[in-house]
Amino acid sequence: MKYYESVADIFCQHGIDRCFALLGDANMHWAGAMHERGVKFVYTRHEHAAVAGAAAYARALGKIGCASVTCGPGLTQIMTILPIAVRANIPMIIFAGEAPIGRTWYNQMIDQAPFVKACGAEYHALHDLNTLGDQINNAFTKAHHNKMPIVLGMPFDLQKMPHTDTPKLAACKIIVETAKNIDLTPDIIETAAQQIAEAKRPVILAGLGAVAAQAKPACVALAEQSGAMLATTLPAKGLFHDQPYNLGVAGGYATQKSKAVFAQSDLVIGVGARLASHSFDGGQLTPNAKVIHLDLSPQATVQGRHAADLLIPADAKYGAEALTAAVKKQTGWRTPEML
């Protein structure tokens, strides 16, 4: 067995069943092995399109995307889409290959890592065959948990080397974060509940994290309990389309009527949302509101802007349910006039 076959095995064991690719010297043997193992390939005319396709696939299906480009000039073509995927927190593995490590000259040889790192992604050079399986497993685990693209570069002469040490080259199971892994501190929930109780015009802003966690019922229940209006970030548009107190999309794409309502809010509860500048219209959308950020990775500062006053590190669904249980029933501004 060749190493490129074992690498393909690990990818398949991690659930990769589709790959977006443009082939060349450094990735064609691996791609052939992936195809033989039943992986469906979507071939593109440009490397940018391959990575963009994998990013869209990852976002649509909620799984790790897979793309592949050849080394050197194949890799440099993804420098536009790669930072986009980084900033969108898209989990993705990009198999790029590398120039042969056993040659002193190769016409497509460049130092690939600085290009990738400059985009904010990580570059893992697969040069140590003794730890190859661990390196690939670590990349999949990090892409999943940190929601980020990782580029794997493996010299194609190493890919074609034979080996017999199959046990070392097996996939490790990725531990998926669930509510059982989350320790909701009672003090934080109590503080948040107090802020919600004091609010007269709260708004719940749900993002893709709420969609992924299937937290819509929990968000609706929290809104009904706290008297809050409902809204979403642009990527989560339509989540509350069937709810009567729905403001629609927040930010620059909000309707004028919704913007007028947002401007009066005194508390925003971000649930599974990034609290990006666009979602708050650069801070102009809710100028007088405090912000609670409920997310697996909550942040006080986002894109150089103060974004939240209270951070709740929790799964969107179970965090919203915990808040609902802690909040006393109140009308807020859920009145007939607001329909």
Model regions and ranges:
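Conformationally flexible catalytic loops at phosphate/diphosphate-handling active centers
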Residues: 138, 142-198
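Short internal beta-strands
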Residues: 21-23, 94-96, 153, 228-234, ...
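Short glycine/serine/threonine-rich phosphate/pyrophosphate-binding segments
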Residues: 27-29, 49-53, 73-82, 86, ...
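Anionic-ligand anchoring segments at beta-strand to alpha-helix junctions in alpha/beta enzyme folds, i.e.
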Residues: 17-55, 60, 68, 184-185, ...
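Conserved thiamine diphosphate
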Residues: 108-146, 264, 309, 319, ...
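Phosphate/diphosphate-binding loops
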Residues: 251-302
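A short helix->loop->beta-strand "cap" motif at the edges of active sites that frequently abuts
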Residues: 39, 90, 227-228, 286-290, ...
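Phosphate/pyrophosphate-binding active-site segments
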Residues: 2-3, 130, 153-154, 166, ...
